[in-house]
Amino acid sequence: KASWRKPWVNSYGHSLTTSVSVSAPEQQLDFSYKIPLLKNPLEQYYLVQGGFKRTDLNDTEQDSTTLAVSRYWDLSSGWQRAINLRWSLDHFTQGEVTDTTMLLYPGVMISRTRSRGGLMPTWGDSQRYSIDYSNTAWGSDVDFSVFQAQNVWIRTLYDRHRFVTRGNLGWIETGDFDKVPPDLRFFAGGDRSIRGYKYKSISPKYSNGDLKGASKLVTGSLEYQYNVTGKWWGAMFVDSGEAVSDIRKSDFKTGAGV
């Protein structure tokens, strides 16, 4: 991965960041242009973001082009609020379904991150909540509502005992799930989801056995870390959760390790 940033584009304080990341399953090119508001440039600003991503992972093949305009408020309380408008054009094959979908959808987001202790925080927490809404009335190819919530808590007791908990929720409401791009569908599995399972390998499947993606997601993790000496830590964890489209067909998966 490589990135380049120009912190001062002009006398108004605009800045530009570009990044490129390349791996076997994903190749991505992004840019972000920040426009501070003169009345409060440190806490209020616009972001214009765009990019292209190619994905070939498990049963997903996708080419995605995106453009977004967002308005941010960084509050003194530590909370960040944003409203955004996104456009995307996706050509994808997910399992046995191939489609091209154009989306134009607004959304809102609120988040906060706090930490103490440097690169290995001894205390901290992170919350992020978002809602996105698409409707064919203004040109999108599919109607949907998407709600997501991510939470992380870190606490340390008596210097040596560190506890990390994580929780993720997601819900998609739509009448045409096959037209929802894979990037918006839910998959579980991997280091930040359910360890012990391949990355994004948990979801409902098509009749041929290919992954379909889910409209509902819930995962949770509890990890205990012990400071053996200096910078050496030992850890044990339990992860559990599911990615399903019918909550009546629960299929919880659990991973544990040390």
What are these regions (language model features)?
Residues 50, 127-135, 142-175:
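Transmembrane beta-barrel strand/turn architecture of Gram-negative outer membrane proteins
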Residues 53, 90, 134-136, 241-243:
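A short, flexible beta-alpha/helix-coil linker loop
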Residues 248-258:
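C-terminal beta-signal and terminal closure region of outer-membrane beta-barrel proteins
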Residues 162-237, 245:
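Extracytoplasmic gating/loop element in the C-terminal half of outer-membrane beta-barrel translocons
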Residues 1-128, 155, 163, 192-196, ...:
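Gram-negative/organellar outer-membrane beta-barrel architecture
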Residues 30, 93-97, 141, 175-185, ...:
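Outer-membrane beta-barrel and related beta-rich outer-membrane complex signature
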Residues 20, 131-133, 240:
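Short glycine-centered, acidic/aromatic-flanked micro-motifs in structured strand/loop junctions
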Residues 70, 105-109, 128-130, 148-150, ...:
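One-face residue pattern on beta-strands with alternating periodicity enriched for small/polar residues
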